[in-house]
Design a protein with these regions (language model features):
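Polysaccharide-binding surfaces and accessory modules of carbohydrate-active proteins
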Residues: 2-9, 13, 18-205
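Extended acidic/polar, glycine-enriched regions
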Residues: 101, 187-266
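Solvent-exposed beta-hairpin/edge-strand motifs
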Residues: 112-124, 633-649, 721-734
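Glycan-recognition and catalytic regions of carbohydrate-active enzymes
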Residues: 157, 528-538, 561-624, 652, ...
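Carbohydrate-binding surface patches
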Residues: 175-183, 187-191, 549, 553-556, ...
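Aromatic-lined carbohydrate-binding/catalytic grooves of carbohydrate-active enzymes
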Residues: 271-408, 412-434
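Glycan-recognition surfaces
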Residues: 363-397, 401, 446-569, 593-597
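Non-catalytic C-terminal accessory domains or segments of carbohydrate-active enzymes
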Residues: 653-762
Length: 762
C-alpha cells in the first residue's frame, strides 16, 4: 500500500488491485474507499488485460505502471497530492510500443461501489447530485435523491446538440450523469465530494452516480474508439477530487481556480454591454434594419450606453457558405462594420464555422467534407434551420483551411473584432472521422485553437453551443444557457404543451435555469453570457417575467446584450434596461444551488460609500402567484434590525426577523436591498437594480449630509433615505429640489447628468 498525505487529504493506493482510498482530514468521517481504476481498449486479440509492473514515489506523487500480456502496451497512472492543494490529482497515459494499432475506448478513472463513499459516520440519506451539462445549451443544476433527471424527448432533433454521446442518459429515479465535473452532496452531513477534470483537451469526461440506497460513482474519459498507432501515446486530462463544505458560498471556487490555471485562462475583459439583432429579427435582417437600430442606440447612448453592436444570423447566403451574401446584402458586411466603428461601437458578427445547413451550397460542392457516421451516412447535427443539419469533418486538411479562411475573412476583410461563434458542438458529434487517430475532444479543441489563432489575440470571441470544457482558455465570453426567447416556456409552430418541459429549447425559463445554476463559473473562466435581455412590450413575456430575466442577468454579473428593436422601445422599458448599468461584479451566491434544481434564492454582497449591503433576489417559479418569505437568519442576520427596499414594487420596510411578500406574480421576483438600521440610511433608488452602486460619496458632518451619485450615464429617478429627522432643506447641485418626508422615509427626485451632488441640512 502506497500513501500520500497533506493537511486536507490522506490517500492510499493498492497497485495490485488497482484501487485507491481517500480520507478527508477536514471532514473527519468523509472518505472514499477502494475506488478502482482501469483502461478499456481493444487489440486484434480482443480486450487487453493489464498487470502491475512497477512504481515510483516522491513526496508529492505516486506513479504506477501496468503492461498488457505482450508487454507492448504500457499504462501509467499518476496520483499527486501537493502540500498547498486540497485536491487529489489523477492522470492516466497509454503508450503503444507494439507494431499493431489498438482501439482505445476509455480511461476508467474510478468505479466506486455503493457503500464505499461516506460523508459522515451515519448512512447518507439526504443526498443530491450537481450535474453540469455537456455544452452551452445543456441543462445544468442539482437533483435530489429520488428525483429523475429531465431529458429531452426530441431524440434526433435535440440529442446530437446537447448530449455527449459518451455520457449515459440516466432515466431512473436517483440515477444522474454529468459532464466534465459534478458534486455528490450529503445535506445532513453538510459535506460534498467535488470531482472534475481540469480540462477537456484530450477527452470528454463523464460522471455517473446512483444515489439510492447509497451513492456509487463512476468516472471515465471517452476515447471514442481512437486508433492508437504504433509508437504513439494517448494521455488523459487531469481529474481532481475534493471534499467540500456544502454551505460554502463558493463551493466550486478552488476547483475553478485550478481549471483556470490549467487552461491559462485569458485575462478577464470588461463585461460587455451591447445590442444583438437575433431575438427581434431572427434571420429577417437587412442593412436598413441594422442601420435603423444603430441610429437608435446612438440616440439613447447617454441614457443606455452600449459598447458592442452585433449582427447575428441572416446576412450569409446559407450556413456553410460564408463568402457569399443574401441578395439584400449586395455590399457584404464591411460597409456595415465600418459604420458601426464610426458610430463608436465595437462591431460584432455571428458565424457558425463547424455546422452546415442541409441545403447549403457546400453540401453539393464538397460532400466529402461532411462528417460521417460509422455506417458511412452523413452525421446528424440536430434540428437547425427547420431541418436536420450536417457538420464539417475538421480532421480533413481542406476543411481546416476552410475554417481558417472563414475566420480570417470576418476579422481581417470584413473588419469585425468581435465574433459570436455558434453551434460549435458540431465538430464533436458521434461520428467516424476521416482521420481516426483523434478523440472528439481533441478535434474540437484543435478547431477552437485554429479560430483563436486566425482571429488573433486581440479579438473578442464569444463561444455559443460549445462543450463547456473545450472553450476554456479560448473564449473571452461563453454562453452558459439555452437560448432565451420572447416566450416563458418552449413552443414550436405555436404548439406549447408537447414542448413545455423540453429542457434545452429556447425560452426565458430555460435560459434562467442555467444563468443561475452556472453563475458559479464566473469570474474564474470567462465572462458568462446569459444570452440576451428582452424588455420590449410586444413579446409574450409578462412584465414579471421580464423583471425576472433582467434580475437574473443583473445579479449574476454576466454580459448585458439587449435584443429588441431599439427604435420602438418605450421610455419605461428603456429605463428598465438601463437599470442594469453599470454591470454588477460577478460574485453571486446561489443560496439554494444544491437544494433546488431551478434556484430561487440568490444574493450579492455589495459596498458603497455608506457601507455594506446585501442584494437578494427571491424568485417565484410557480405558475400562480404565491407569498415569498424573507428570513433574516437565512442570510446571516441574527436578531438584527434591518431596513429593506424592494426594487420592482418600491416597498420599504423595517425587518427584525422576517418579512412576507404577498402575492408575488407567477414567474415573478422580488429584488431586495437589505441594510442595517441606522438613524440616517441610504435605502436605494429606482436608478439601478442593485439600489446602491450609484452612491459614490456620503459625508455626514454635524447636521449636514452631502451625497454624491454617479452612474456613468444620464438618468432621472427617485432616491430613498431612511431619516429619523425631517430635513430643513435639500439641494441638488446648488438648487432646491423636490423632496418628501413621511414615516421616516425621505424621497428625493434626482436628475443625473452622469453624476450629481445632493446637500441636506437637518
Amino acid at each position: 500500500m502506497n500513501t500520500l498525505t497533506n493537511s486536507s487529504i490522506n490517500f492510499s493506493v493498492d497497485p495490485q488491485s488497482r484501487s485507491f482510498s481517500l480520507f478527508s482530514s477536514t471532514f473527519k468521517s468523509a472518505k472514499l474507499d477502494r475506488a478502482s481504476f482501469d483502461l478499456e481498449l481493444m487489440t486484434a486479440n480482443g480486450k487487453a488485460e493489464f498487470s502491475f509492473t512497477s512504481q515510483e514515489q516522491t513526496d508529492n506523487s505516486i506513479s504506477l505502471t501496468y503492461h498488457d500480456r505482450s508487454q507492448k502496451l504500457e499504462l501509467t497512472v499518476v496520483f499527486n497530492l501537493f502540500p498547498d492543494k486540497a485536491f487529489l490529482f489523477q492522470k492516466m497515459r497509454l503508450e503503444n510500443h507494439g507494431d499493431e494499432t489498438v482501439t482505445v475506448k476509455r480511461f476508467l478513472f474510478s468505479q466506486v461501489q455503493a457503500g464505499m463513499l461516506h460523508f459522515s459516520e451515519n448512512q447518507a440519506i439526504q443526498t443530491a447530485f450537481y450535474s453540469n451539462g455537456w455544452q452551452s445549451w445543456s441543462p445544468s443544476g442539482t437533483w435530489q435523491a429520488g428525483e429523475k433527471q429531465i431529458r429531452s424527448r426530441l431524440k434526433p432533433f435535440a440529442h446530437p446538440m446537447i448530449y455527449n454521446p459518451g455520457t449515459p442518459l440516466t432515466k431512473a429515479e436517483s440515477e444522474f450523469s454529468s459532464d466534465m465535473f459534478a458534486a455528490i452532496l450529503d445535506h445532513q452531513a453538510r459535506v460534498g465530494l467535488i470531482v472534475g477534470f481540469l480540462s477537456q483537451k484530450e477527452q470528454f469526461g463523464s460522471i455517473v452516480s446512483t444515489l439510492h440506497p447509497e451513492p456509487d460513482l463512476q468516472i471515465w474519459a471517452n476515447c471514442d474508439d481512437l486508433q492508437l498507432l504504433p509508437g504513439k501515446q494517448l494521455q488523459s486530462d487531469t481529474l481532481v477530487w475534493q471534499f467540500s463544505d456544502t454551505l460554502n458560498p463558493e463551493p466550486f471556487k478552488a476547483y475553478f481556480e485550478a481549471v483556470s490555471a490549467e487552461n491559462q485562462v485569458r485575462q478577464r475583459m470588461k463585461t460587455p454591454v451591447g445590442w444583438c439583432s437575433w431575438y427581434y429579427y431572427f434571420q429577417k435582417i437587412s442593412p436598413e434594419i441594422i442601420r435603423s437600430n444603430l441610429r437608435a442606440v446612438q440616440k439613447t447612448q447617454e441614457q443606455f450606453p452600449l459598447d458592442v453592436f452585433q449582427i447575428d444570423d441572416g446576412f450569409e447566403q446559407d450556413v456553410g457558405t460564408w463568402d457569399k451574401f443574401q441578395p439584400i446584402f449586395p455590399d457584404g458586411m464591411k460597409p456595415l462594420s465600418q459604420e458601426i466603428h464610426n458610430a463608436g461601437y465595437q462591431a460584432g458578427v455571428w458565424l457558425a464555422p463547424f455546422i452546415v445547413q442541409r441545403d447549403s451550397e457546400l453540401v453539393n460542392t464538397h460532400p466529402e467534407w461532411l462528417l460521417k457516421t460509422i455506417k458511412g451516412k452523413r452525421a446528424n447535427s440536430g434540428f437547425v434551420w427547420n431541418n436536420l443539419g450536417y457538420a464539417l469533418d475538421l480532421t480533413i486538411p481542406e476543411v481546416e483551411e476552410f475554417v481558417r479562411q472563414t475566420i480570417r475573412r470576418a476579422v481581417s476583410d470584413w473588419e469585425f473584432p468581435y465574433l459570436k461563434l455558434d453551434f460549435l458542438y458540431a465538430a464533436a458529434l458521434d461520428c467516424d472521422y476521416s482521420n481516426p487517430i483523434f478523440t472528439r475532444a481533441q478535434v474540437l479543441r484543435k478547431g477552437l485553437e485554429i479560430i483563436r489563432e486566425e482571429a488573433g489575440d486581440n479579438a473578442i470571441l464569444l463561444g455559443c453551443g460549445v462543450p463547456i470544457g473545450s472553450g476554456i482558455g479560448i473564449f473571452d465570453m461563453l454562453r452558459i444557457s439555452a437560448d432565451v426567447s420572447p416566450d416563458w416556456a418552449p413552443k414550436f409552430l405555436g404548439l406549447k404543451s408537447i414542448f413545455r418541459n423540453e429542457p434545452n429549447m429556447p425560452s426565458a425559463k430555460n435560459a434562467i435555469q442555467n444563468i443561475l445554476s452556472r453563475s458559479i463559473m464566473e469570474p474564474h473562466l470567462w465572462v458568462n453570457d446569459p444570452d440576451c435581455l428582452l424588455v420590449r412590450e410586444d413579446s409574450n413575456l409578462s412584465l414579471p417575467e421580464v423583471q425576472s430575466l433582467a434580475t437574473a442577468i443583473s445579479i449574476t454579473g454576466g454580459a448585458v446584450l439587449i435584443s429588441d428593436d431599439m427604435s420602438k422601445l418605450s421610455a419605461d422599458r428603456l429605463k428598465l434596461a438601463a437599470s442594469l448599468l453599470p454591470v454588477l461584479p460577478a460574485k453571486p451566491h446561489v443560496r439554494d444551488l444544491f437544494s433546488q434544481n431551478m434556484p430561487s434564492q440568490i444574493s450579492q454582497d455589495l459596498q458603497n460609500a455608506q457601507g455594506d449591503w446585501k442584494l437578494i433576489a427571491l424568485f417565484n417559479w410557480q405558475d400562480q402567484a404565491v407569498d415569498l418569505q424573507l428570513n433574516l437568519k437565512d442570510w446571516g442576520f441574527d436578531e438584527q434590525e434591518m431596513l429593506m427596499r424592494e426594487f420592482w414594487s418600491s416597498e420599504i420596510a423595517q425587518i427584525q426577523q422576517s418579512h412576507t411578500f404577498k402575492n408575488v406574480e407567477a414567474h415573478g421576483v422580488r429584488l431586495i436591498a437589505l441594510r442595517p438600521l441606522r438613524p440616517l440610511t441610504y435605502l436605494g433608488s429606482d436608478l439601478h437594480l442593485a439600489q446602491g452602486v450609484e452612491l459614490k460619496h456620503w459625508q455626514l458632518a454635524d447636521s449636514n449630509l452631502e451625497i454624491g451619485l454617479d452612474l456613468g450615464r444620464k438618468a432621472e429617478g427617485t432616491v430613498y433615505l431612511w431619516s429619523e429627522k425631517e430635513p430643513r432643506s435639500v439641494e441638488q447641485n446648488g438648487k432646491n429640489t423636490h423632496w418628501q418626508w413621511k414615516d421616516n422615509i425621505l424621497t428625493l427626485k434626482v436628475t443625473l447628468d452622469k453624476e450629481t451632488t445632493i446637500h441636506l441640512k437637518f
